[in-house]
Amino acid sequence: MRAWFAAGATTAFTGRYVLLRVLLHRFTRDVAALNAGDHRPLLSAYRHDAVLRSGELDHRWSGVYVGRDAIEEFLRTFVASRLRGEIGAAYFGGPPWRMTTLVRFTTHVIAPNGAVRHRNRTILQVRTKWGRIVEQEDFYENTARAEAFDARLRQLGLDATG
């Protein structure tokens, strides 16, 4: 009986570890595609009725985006702004059918001469059902940086869609 329990527990822990590694790999791959200008792989991770909340601030990325069409517009704006993102750390909790993930996400823009034009960190709180994003809320480390970067883009004549 103990051997069966140990085997079952080991299988459960191993399965969870593998699932988390697969999810992190997929997210990393989707962010790499986003950085290369293709938002579609990341968009496919959202359910059709997903909700993305990106702060109530004074910049082009703030607002509540309901549904994949609205989220696609958010991602297009991200790409058009020449932002690049990288995953710093990810924490997972809950069962696969109702998982919550916290991701430390750093955004930056590097000028052609190598100078950093913008850098900010965001915590993404993501709720999923069976690996599909149903809700995401973004918490900016420094809201003034996002607003200043958006103001600079407007000075350069880049509207919200690039």
Would you name each region that the model predicts?
Residues H108-R117:
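Short, cysteine-centered beta-strand-loop-beta hairpins and adjacent loop/turn segments enriched
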Residues D30, L42-L43, A50, G67, ...:
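Hydrophobic pocket/interface hotspot
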Residues W97-T107:
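A short hydrophobic beta-strand element
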